[in-house]
Swiss-Prot record:
It comes from Streptococcus equi subsp. zooepidemicus (strain MGCS10565). Catalyzes the formation of acetyl phosphate from acetate and ATP. Can also catalyze the reverse reaction. This is Acetate kinase. Homodimer. InterPro entries: Ac/propionate_kinase, Aliphatic_acid_kin_short-chain, Aliphatic_acid_kinase_CS, ATPase_NBD. Its cofactor is Mg(2+); Mn(2+). The gene is ackA. GO terms for cellular component: cytoplasm. GO terms for biological process: acetate metabolic process; acetyl-CoA biosynthetic process.
Length: 400
């Protein structure tokens, strides 16, 4: 039986999940954090057990070695030969990649070239790819792109209203992100509703530390909130989301700590959003604790967060000319009932109504009332499974 690893590598972390395929059975999962530091943390979960170790992991190559050694050490696999495929989540595929691809040297180079579109993600992903190809050179490696699902957007949707030379010369356009998640939950929503996906109009809300909203028409992405980079859209955990671009040169002129545009963009990516406004945390659980304590900064951050999400959902009702369902997914989308309640209550004009008894922590499924004209669903995303499936599919093309 073949085993496939789904990888989500960042600049200082490597998250993984091992599947037995084609049964789609999760055998183990884990994460290696703080790569590049002497107190890196490796966590492995398998058979109801959890192993955690602190050690020195200087780079992604050593992280991959540690991961593979752990799989052997804990008896999860007997030999590396059992692993027949590795799938890598890539945030930005630009216009190079409209679907998942088998990795070769050119693919790795293109992923690195696209780092400007996802500076927090693509460099780490490329490092992860190179590490696996070095250590397991004979297995099939596949790249699965967050942007691929959004390549169905029409030109009038993905182009920005700036001179077209910036698109033709520099490929400045909306690319979107979280596409693997949006695709998966839309397919699951169709099953839940008992209707063909190609008959549905859905708004999918991926609300985690990163937040993106997508308008899905008959199974295809027709608009999405993330843009040229994952910085665009609603307010997020540490990202600002959409702001007036004229703020950037203004801040450079006013704040001596912000020396150039890169400094401002770094601030917008890493020091803004819920964490930046509240001064407390980027974690919604901490923000909700602040609400309970009547912390004014927590209240302000929460209100901005809800307001921005509602506005994007409202936009996509207009884009789709109505919707059959609103789908919440990802960390906050699945586990923050107060957030879901306040978003939906602010959109009641569209005919949505939440059942408070179903809108509780841990519930999955239809949380709307019987009278709700638009269904409200909570669906757990499974990007890793989507990656593993694409590896299995593309392995057949390599062997044929």
């Amino acid at each position: 039986m073949s085993k496939t690893i789904a990888i989500n590598a960042g600049s200082s972390s490597l998250k993984w999940q091992l599947y037995q395929m084609p049964e789609e059975k999760v055998l183990a999962q884990g994460i290696i954090e703080r790569i590049g530091l002497t107190d890196s943390i490796s966590t492995v979960k398998y058979d109801g057990k959890k192993e955690e170790h602190i050690l020195d992991i200087p780079d992604h190559t050593e992280a991959v070695k540690r991961l593979l050694n752990d799989l052997i050490h804990f008896g999860i696999i007997d030999t590396y030969d059992e692993i027949t495929g590795v799938g890598h989540r890539i945030v930005a595929g630009g216009e190079y990649f409209k679907e998942s691809v088998v990795v070769d040297d050119k693919v790795v180079e293109q992923v690195e070239e696209l780092a400007a579109l996802a500076p927090l993600h693509n460099p780490g992903a490329a490092a992860g790819i190179r590490a696996f190809r070095k250590i397991l050179p004979d297995i099939t490696s596949v790249c699965v792109f967050d942007t691929s699902f959004h390549t169905t957007m029409q030109k009038h949707t993905y182009l920005y209203p700036i001179p077209q030379k910036y698109y033709t010369d520099y490929k400045v356009r909306k690319y979107g992100a979280h596409g693997t998640s949006h695709k998966y939950v839309a397919e699951e929503a169709a099953k839940m509703l008992g209707r063909p996906l190609d008959e549905l109009k859905l708004i999918t809300a991926h609300v985690g530390n990163g937040v993106s909203i997508t308008a899905n028409y008959h199974g295809q992405s027709v608009d999405t909130s993330m843009g040229f980079t994952p910085l665009a859209g609603p307010m997020m955990g540490t990202r600002s989301g959409d702001i007036d671009p004229a703020i950037i040169p203004y801040l450079i002129a006013q704040d001596p700590e912000l020396k150039d545009a890169a400094d401002v963009v770094n601030m917008l990516n890493k020091q803004s959003g819920l964490g930046g406004v509240s001064g407390i945390s980027s974690d919604m659980r901490d923000i909700e604790a602040g609400l309970q304590a009547n912390n004014p900064d927590a209240v302000l951050a929460y209100n901005i967060f809800i307001d921005r999400i509602k506005k994007f959902i409202g936009q996509y009702f207009a884009v789709l000319n109505g919707a059959d369902a609103l789908v919440f997914t990802a960390g906050m989308g699945e586990n923050a009932p107060l957030m879901r309640q306040d978003v939906v209550n602010g959109l009641s004009w569209f005919g949505m109504e939440i059942d408070p008894e179903k809108n509780v922590f841990g519930y999955r499924g239809d949380i709307s009332t019987a009278a709700s004209k638009v269904k409200v669903l909570v669906i757990s995303t499974d990007e890793e499974l989507c990656i593993a499936r694409d590896v299995e599919r593309l392995k057949k093309t390599v062997s044929s």
